[in-house]
Amino acid sequence: MTTPGGRDDDAWGQVNELFDTLDKVRKLLTDPAMSSIRLVVNPEKMVIKETQRTYTYLNLYGYATDAILCNRIIPPEVTDPYFAMWKANQQDNIAYIGEAFGELPVMKAPLFGHEVGGLDTLRKLADALYADKNPATQMFDGQTHRIEGDSTTGFTLVVPLPFANKDDLDLYRSRDELTLRVGPYRRNIVLPYALWDLEIGDV
């Protein structure tokens, strides 16, 4: 084809090739057997809230999260009274992280006395987070959505959306696809053939 600039090349072919590549990357990243995400959070309220929001949208788009890495925890050997309130607040926030993210394992790393850089410090960080565990091991195997029920009792599509507000949810339907919207974000879920002719009962 001829592009507006007058060059004769297979521009559409290049565009299609790009989309094919992006689709392969998406399939790789959304396959929990191949890829998973670990969210890093500091034990601070604002950071926790933003991490919760990120986790919601990762679930919405089908990306598996297998662990929470809690970073920059003031270690017990810091006994200066100046940090007493900071340490107490961190412990409260760490407890909240454990509650908020449900079954996801929470691994903890201390606040080092210097910037983390270089192999020696990175090894110390890895030891603190993983100890004897293999970092390449999948820490949690959860589903981003599943279908429950049967033709007699009805089917339920379950999409875990931690921390999402029901008032922010919208659901649209075409014959073979559901579009789920959470605030400004949306996800399209392709339905199996058995559900194509069924009506949505409730959300």
PLM segments and residue spans:
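Short, solvent-exposed coil/turn segments
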Residues: 152, 173, 196-198
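Switch- and interface-adjacent substructures of P-loop NTPase systems
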Residues: 1-34
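Beta-rich strand-turn-strand
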Residues: 167, 196-203
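Beta-strand-rich binding/interaction modules
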Residues: 167-172, 177-181
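Extracellular/lumenal and peripheral-membrane lipid-interaction modules
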Residues: 3, 7, 185, 196
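C-terminal lobe/tail of nucleotide-utilizing enzymes
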Residues: 22-164, 179, 184-186, 190
